[in-house]
């Protein structure tokens, strides 16, 4: 939107939210709002022209809404992202202008690309982490095994883990590029730089990033399944029939059919095996912190999960 609010005002943000809060009510498709950004989206099919018409009708409705409330859209900044290889890539217009098609778009800090492989997002995260790691090395002449982990976990690792439940690298090259940042960081402590990566992690009490992504998947699954986040679990999982095996938990989920690698590595598919293999006492934890403690304890007893390296 072209409209804005004075920087630093107290009531400005609240008033702006009030002004745009009813925008989603004028459309029939899904519409998500964040500050002055709006996303309109829906599933489309090659032979379903109704979906094309539906999107255009909604765009026209938004334009009419903006004119009514004198909150004009900045059409030059409005883009169209078509996701999927079979997407018909229909053209849409706003105020008589054809919206520009893009291959990627940043959404809340995560670069979403048209094929959902997230190569650009991975490269962006690695670049930010590299810059942060470089600043640490320039700012501190000597780093010990206490200081480095603290700085790394505070300033570098967040860049590599922000939103990774969505974009977590599943291609070998991307995964190696992400892990390489931590490899370089752990060499910053004198006396252990010549040790193997696995041994450096043990000395610094750091898990591998791959292990943290796997653990993070389980934590998010737990939150969704148990209703600890404002997400409908039916949008993510199909629950399997009740299990009668002793020790089996009641929240087992079915694994959706996935042919393509991208689909196999989406969150709702990749978490199924790990989640279903968790014991009942872990899944039925009362709080998120209790779940974290129990899954760490459980995985620590399993040979395939015991080492986070």
Residue ranges and their predicted role:
Residues 13-42:
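Active-site palm subdomain of RNA-directed nucleic acid polymerases
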